[in-house]
């Protein structure tokens, strides 16, 4: 703690700028940022870059008169503006306009904090300590969640197909079943589409529904071919750890198709289910990791899933294929009252 009084130390000030936002980002979004590649990136983003900026300020203060005269103020700018910008990202993600607005506001506020930088830094470290404890408790409670629910009661994972048709799982997110669409809150006449499905020998399950509140919990159950109870009955708890890997990694469904020499393709329009960069079990994904920003929260880039589907079908027409096509938009209705826009707006 004695070193914290040295507010002109580039390392102390730089770490103070990013440590709490770094830990808060992991505490609030752990299931989105749990890969090693992301950890290394965020260490550089939250901690190394602020330290480098402060070292540069120190160098400039020795060579440039203006920087030397106003070094304390520049250091305050670096700390306060950096802390606010990084924390804003941790809370809302890469929303550039809001982050820029926060930086502008905190730039002005920094003039008032110039004489209190020592107290500001101590407060930032105290906040970091508090969230570090919260993060440790969360990780301790979740990192070792039992995967026993994924154990299958038989050897279906070793099945060998006698026929090899193309298989398509087409998932319009939140698309209600035939009976539900006709009633509240939807009141949608979907008879033309239902007639088309019947004409093409599709099987319609009128009252089919998911017991889960969102895409991740529902799909993790489907691809594990087992029911799980995470988030039940506590619907307001954080997303259970590891569920995304149950969808995008080598789950039992994908592994069965891989063992039967299928080409497996994950067609997604948003990187929502792969934002934490799990090791993919599919042969192909419509969003490669090299195009996925480390700052992404899953909805800040998009591809045309229909175009991707047409491309995949054309390229793979001479082999058996398994496709999981997830269409996020327009999304499911709100599942809690406080998030709902009201019956009429949700129906739209």
Where are these regions (language model features)?
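A long, amphipathic alpha-helix that forms part
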Residues: 146-162, 310, 340-348
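Transmembrane and membrane-interface helices of multi-pass
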Residues: 1-146
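Helix-boundary/low-complexity linker signature
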Residues: 7, 163-164
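Feature captures the catalytic ectodomains and active-site-proximal regions of enzymes
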Residues: 29-37, 61, 331-333, 340-348
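Short, well-ordered helical secondary-structure segments
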Residues: 120, 157-159, 209, 312
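Active-site-proximal alpha/beta segments of enzymes that process anionic O-linked groups
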Residues: 49-113, 164-169, 174-341
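Alpha-helical membrane-embedding segments
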Residues: 132-143, 153-161, 180-187
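Membrane-interface anchor segments at the N-terminal boundary of transmembrane helices
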Residues: 33-46, 293, 297-303, 347-348
């Amino acid at each position: 703690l004695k070193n914290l009084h040295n507010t002109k130390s580039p390392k102390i000030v730089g770490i103070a700028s990013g440590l709490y936002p770094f830990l808060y980002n992991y505490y609030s979004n752990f299931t989105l940022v749990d890969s090693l590649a992301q950890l290394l990136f965020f260490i550089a983003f939250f901690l190394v870059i602020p330290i480098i900026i402060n070292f540069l300020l120190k160098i400039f203060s020795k060579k440039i008169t203006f920087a030397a005269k106003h070094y304390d103020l520049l250091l305050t700018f670096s700390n306060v503006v950096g802390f606010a910008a990084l924390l804003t990202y941790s809370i809302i993600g890469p929303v550039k306009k809001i982050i820029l607005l926060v930086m502008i506001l905190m730039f002005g506020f920094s003039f008032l904090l110039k004489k209190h930088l020592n107290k500001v830094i101590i407060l930032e470290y105290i906040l970091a300590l508090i969230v570090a404890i919260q993060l440790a408790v969360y990780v301790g409670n979740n990192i070792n969640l039992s995967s026993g629910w994924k154990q299958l009661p038989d050897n279906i994972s070793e099945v060998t197909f006698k026929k090899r048709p193309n298989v398509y799982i087409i998932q319009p997110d939140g698309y209600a079943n035939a009976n539900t669409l006709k009633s509240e809150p939807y009141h949608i006449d979907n008879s033309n589409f239902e007639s088309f499905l019947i004409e093409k020998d599709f099987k319609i399950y009128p009252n089919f529904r998911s017991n889960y509140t969102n895409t991740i919990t529902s799909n993790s159950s489907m691809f594990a071919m087992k029911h799980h109870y995470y988030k039940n009955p506590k619907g307001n708890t954080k997303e259970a750890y590891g569920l995304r890997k149950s969808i995008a990694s080598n789950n039992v469904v994908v592994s069965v198709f891989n063992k039967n020499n299928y080409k497996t393709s994950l067609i997604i329009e948003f990187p929502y289910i792969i934002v934490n960069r799990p090791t993919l079990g599919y042969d192909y994904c419509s969003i490669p990791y090299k195009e996925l920003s480390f700052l992404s929260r899953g909805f800040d880039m998009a591809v045309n899933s229909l175009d991707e589907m047409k491309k995949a079908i054309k390229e793979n027409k001479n082999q058996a294929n398994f496709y999981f096509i997830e269409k996020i938009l327009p999304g499911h209705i709100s599942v809690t009252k406080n998030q709902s826009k009201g019956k009429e707006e949700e129906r739209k």
